[in-house]
Every structure is written in structure tokens, then in C-alpha cells.
Design a protein with these regions (language model features):
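Class I SAM-dependent methyltransferase SAM/SAH-binding core
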Residues: 61, 67-121
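Conserved beta-strand signature within the Rossmann-like core of class I S-adenosyl-L-methionine
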Residues: 172-180
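Conserved Class I S-adenosyl-L-methionine
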Residues: 216-268
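N-terminal auxiliary segments of SAM/dcSAM-dependent transferases
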Residues: 1-14
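C-terminal alpha-helical "lid/dimerization" subdomain adjacent to the S-adenosyl-L-methionine
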Residues: 180-227, 243-247
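A short SAM/SAH-binding and catalytic strip from SAM-dependent methyltransferases
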Residues: 145-159
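A short, conserved alpha-helix within the catalytic core of class I
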Residues: 156-168
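Class I SAM-dependent methyltransferase Rossmann-like catalytic core
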Residues: 13-51
Length: 268
């Protein structure tokens, strides 16, 4: 299979209110349905230790959250399993609608947008960047029970991605990602998104996303505690800190999970 190739996607450069961008974001909801993204995320969440423990309240951060509707679907599906969640929806654009926030509230989730570039977030000592909308004060260093990234990590080359993952490892108990799979079947599927009514922006970006996607253990290799994988080399102390899992999911997706093996309190 081809080497990983990251190219800027068209949607990233369109204004929030550009008609093509508005249409493309609607397309993404159909793409998620076609890929079964919500069910993939639900399975990943239900496989975590924190889900089995049903501990709460929980603090959750979604990176590259977009309009927040995918995560809302996850919250609705989880139902009473997680009745009390503090959620931050991080994106560099302010796309979350009041109706979406109301939907989270109906699930018992307190959701707020966090408008900041993720690399700014990753480069600061705290978990947020003031004066970004919805951000905590610059002196705060909150930890997250769970950080989620969905169709987001593939936007980054290895160096910035490693920086992002290092920030996630420092600030979370668990990190989940669902990304495009870099494989022949996924590439064929990306050329067919027009069949579900996708516009030109979405059709072009779908192909680019597969070329920038992942396979094998590529995300694990960039995780700062990658020695946590079974039989991996490295410092035994670091190996004891995390359990990693990386695998294909469905026809088109690639999943990664990193979870602290000792869940004693908040992450540092």
C-alpha cells in the first residue's frame, strides 16, 4: 500500500459561512453514517476501563469536533451509562449550534465549545489557550478522563502529530481516535462518495483523507509511551503506564486506543 501522504484538504481553507463549506459539513454527516463512525466510537468507548467502571462525573475533550453532532449522537446512544459528563468541543472554528448544546444538556452532558487551534492547545502547559472562546484560565491545567479524535489525526504529518499525541498522553487517562484507513478498499470507497450526494469539496477531500490515513501500528509508533504495546522495547517504567491497541474497524476506518493501566485519580 502507498506511503502516507498528507495534503491540506479544501474544507480547511473555506470560510465558515462559505456555501461549499456548509454543504460539505452536511456531507460529512452522511459520510459518518456510511462509515458507521458512531458505532465504531461507541464500541471503542465501551471497551475502555472507565466505561466498565461507570465512574463519574467524567471530563471529556473532543479534538477537531466540528459542529459537534457526531459526539451528540454518541452521547445519546450512551444514555444512562454516562449520565454526568463535562464535554469540551475543541475546534479552530466556532461551528457548534445552540440546538446541539441543548441536545447534550438533555443527555445530562454539560458541553461547551473550545475555539482554539489544536497545535496551540498542544504547545501550552495547560489544556486550553486563553483567550480562546470557552477556554479555561491560562493558569489552569485540567486533566481529561477521555480525549477523542475523530477523522482528525490524519490532517497532521508525523512531527506535529507526535506533538499532539504527547499533549494528549500528558493530559488524559484515555485517548481514542477513529481515522481513515489507508487501504485499497477505502480508496475505492473515497472515489464513490458522490453516490451519497457529496459535493466537489467532499469528493476531493475524501480521497486526500485516505492517502493521509493510517494502517498497521503507525499511530502507536508516535505515541510517547509506545513501548506499552505487548513485547515492545523501551523503558519498563514507561511500558507499565499505558495499554495501546490499534486496529482496522469496518471497511474504511482505523482505530487507536491508549489507556493508562493504573487509573488512580486524574491524569497529571
Amino acid at each position: 500500500m502507498m506511503a502516507r501522504w498528507v495534503t491540506a484538504e479544501a474544507l480547511d481553507h473555506l470560510a465558515t459561512d462559505d456555501p461549499s463549506a456548509l454543504r460539505s459539513r452536511r456531507d460529512l454527516r452522511r459520510v459518518h453514517r456510511a462509515m458507521g463512525t458512531r458505532q465504531i466510537l461507541l464500541r471503542a468507548i465501551r471497551a475502555t476501563q472507565m466505561y466498565r467502571q461507570r465512574a463519574g462525573p467524567l471530563r471529556v475533550l473532543e479534538l477537531g469536533a466540528g459542529d459537534g453532532t457526531l459526539m451528540l449522537g454518541v452521547a445519546q446512544a450512551l444514555g444512562d451509562a454516562w449520565p454526568s459528563v463535562e464535554l469540551r468541543l475543541l475546534d479552530r472554528q466556532d461551528l457548534v449550534q445552540p440546538s446541539t448544546l441543548a441536545g447534550f444538556a438533555a443527555c445530562g452532558w454539560a458541553a461547551k465549545p473550545l475555539v482554539v487551534d489544536v497545535l496551540e492547545w498542544a504547545g501550552l502547559p495547560g489544556a486550553a489557550s486563553a483567550p480562546a472562546m470557552g477556554a479555561e484560565p491560562p493558569t489552569a491545567t485540567p486533566a481529561w478522563d477521555l480525549i477523542i479524535a475523530n477523522l482528525f489525526l490524519h490532517h497532521f504529518d508525523a512531527a506535529p502529530l507526535a506533538r499532539l499525541l504527547a499533549a494528549a498522553a500528558t493530559r488524559s487517562r484515555c485517548f481514542l481516535a477513529c481515522e481513515p484507513r489507508r487501504a485499497g478498499a477505502a480508496l475505492v470507497g473515497s472515489h464513490l462518495v458522490g453516490l451519497i450526494g457529496a459535493n466537489a469539496v467532499t469528493r476531493a477531500d475524501a480521497v486526500l483523507s485516505v492517502h493521509a490515513g493510517f494502517r498497521g501500528q503507525e499511530i502507536s509508533a508516535l505515541w510517547p509511551a509506545s513501548a506499552a504495546t505487548a513485547g515492545g522495547p523501551g523503558d519498563p517504567g514507561r511500558a507499565a503506564a499505558w495499554t495501546l491497541a490499534e486496529h482496522s474497524a469496518g471497511l474504511f476506518s482505523h482505530c487507536f486506543r491508549a489507556e493508562r493501566r493504573v487509573a488512580a485519580g486524574r491524569a497529571p
